[in-house]
Structures are given as structure tokens and as C-alpha cells.
């Protein structure tokens, strides 16, 4: 399995591995987690660790939104490449948004809702809808600090967010399709990076590169933080801008 940097990154730690999206690093994580005390590797052992933490962070469950949602699938084959999102991993964009929220909140996994409130014909509130915490991932804060810093570094390497006006943390992830179709573009992230208020996931089917997903995410953050006139964002036509990114 190749990394985008064919020369390799040398000896790096987790924060830089996230920043550089180093396939070698995370493949090695998957390999080592599949070893026993004698160093013998087991595909099933590696997958069981992946599935355990995927379950804790909610990736094996629907999100609770009030529309039809496909069931997620945590990879059950090809253990080592599964640690970089390959294998048989399959998730909806809403499930990845919940995943981003769990990271932003240092482990709080929510059941989501698309509804704010239910009112009567006079506007009186009959019921309010709030997301419910269904699990809290029990790992030490220094682990979350490493992840948060790594994701913050990712965004510093992507010029799509230059001059945004709010600090963002996130991760790109171009998904290969086949030789006949363009790749899917993906970005998950949250802002402000130091005190998150919003978490998002952007998927562009056959979007060629995650750089294009970053352009969309930049517009979304501009809109929700009211950083620019919405008419300059909601133009009613597709943007002609395209963007590439290397460290996916």
C-alpha cells in the first residue's frame, strides 16, 4: 500500500502522521494491533480492535435522523488497509458528521435529529428535540489532544481555508472508485478548532479530489459563522473553481 509521499515521511509521530495523512503509519498501526505477544499477526485480531473502537465512536450504528438512512458497515476484511478507510468500510455522510462531532467533543457520541421543535398552529412549542449522548469514548485526554492538533495541522496545509476568519480542524480523505470513474472527495471537520460549535462532513461523489470538498466546507463555515454575504455563497450555480490536495 503506497503513501502519497512515495519517498516516505521518515520517523514521525501521530500528530504529524495525521497532518501528512501517512498511509504507512496507519497501516503499521493496524499491523501492530493484530500481533500477539510473540509478534504473530492475525487478521481477525486486528479487525476486532478496529471494530471495537468503531463501535464505541458510533460508526456501527445509524445516527437517529428522521429520514431513511443506510446502515453503516465497519470493515470485516483486509485488516491493514482498513485502518486508512479501505477494506469494506461504508458510511453515510451523516454518520461521518456524527463521527466528526465525537472527535470535536473528545468522545461524546450523539443520536442526531433533524428537528428543532414541534409547534401547534399558534406557534406554541409542543416538543423540543435535542441530540442525546449515547456513549462517551473512554480514552485519555492526551489522545484527543494529539488527534485535535493533528487535524488542526491538516487544515493549515490546505489553502482552501486561507483567510476564512475562524480556525478549523479537519481531515480530508479522497476515496478511490475505479479506473473508469473519478474519485470521491471528502472532508470532515469542526470549528472553531479550540472551542468547537459546529462539526460537518462533506462528500462530493466523483468529486475528483478532496480539495473540492474543502472548498465546499469553507463556504459552509463562512455561511454558518456569517463571515460573508450569503448571496456570494448561495449563487444558484455550481462554482467553476476546482482545487487539488496532495496529502490525502
Where are these regions (language model features)?
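Beta-lactam-recognizing serine transpeptidase/beta-lactamase-like catalytic domain environment
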Residues: 1-204, 247-248
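Short amphipathic alpha-helical face segments that pack within enzyme cores
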Residues: 92-98, 212-219
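Short strand->helix junction
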Residues: 206-209
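Short, gly/Ser/Thr-rich active-site loops of penicillin-recognizing serine hydrolases
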Residues: 124-132, 218-248
Amino acid at each position: 500500500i503506497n503513501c502519497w509521499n512515495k519517498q516516505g515521511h521518515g520517523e514521525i509521530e501521530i500528530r504529524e502522521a495525521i497532518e501528512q495523512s501517512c498511509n504507512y503509519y496507519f497501516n503499521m498501526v493496524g499491523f501492530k494491533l493484530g500481533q500477539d505477544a510473540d509478534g504473530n499477526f492475525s487478521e481477525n485480531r486486528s479487525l476486532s480492535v478496529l471494530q471495537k473502537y468503531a463501535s464505541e465512536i458510533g460508526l456501527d450504528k445509524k445516527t437517529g435522523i428522521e429520514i431513511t438512512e443506510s446502515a453503516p458497515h465497519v470493515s470485516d476484511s483486509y485488516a491493514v488497509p482498513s485502518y486508512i478507510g479501505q477494506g469494506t468500510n461504508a458510511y453515510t455522510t451523516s454518520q461521518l458528521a456524527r463521527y466528526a462531532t465525537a472527535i470535536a467533543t473528545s468522545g461524546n457520541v450523539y443520536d442526531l435529529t433533524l428537528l428543532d421543535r414541534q409547534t401547534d398552529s399558534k406557534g406554541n412549542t409542543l416538543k423540543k428535540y435535542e441530540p442525546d449522548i449515547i456513549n462517551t469514548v473512554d480514552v485519555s485526554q492526551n489522545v484527543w489532544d494529539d488527534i485535535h492538533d493533528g487535524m488542526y495541522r491538516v487544515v493549515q496545509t490546505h489553502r482552501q481555508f486561507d483567510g476564512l476568519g475562524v480556525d478549523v480542524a479537519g481531515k480530508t480523505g479522497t476515496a478511490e472508485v475505479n479506473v473508469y470513474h473519478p474519485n470521491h472527495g471528502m472532508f470532515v471537520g469542526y470549528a472553531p478548532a479550540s472551542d468547537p460549535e459546529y462539526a460537518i462532513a462533506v462528500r462530493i461523489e466523483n468529486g475528483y479530489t478532496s480539495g473540492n470538498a474543502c472548498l465546499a466546507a469553507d463556504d459552509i463555515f463562512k455561511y454558518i459563522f456569517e463571515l460573508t454575504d450569503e448571496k456570494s455563497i448561495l449563487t444558484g450555480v455550481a462554482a467553476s473553481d476546482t482545487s487539488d490536495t496532495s496529502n490525502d
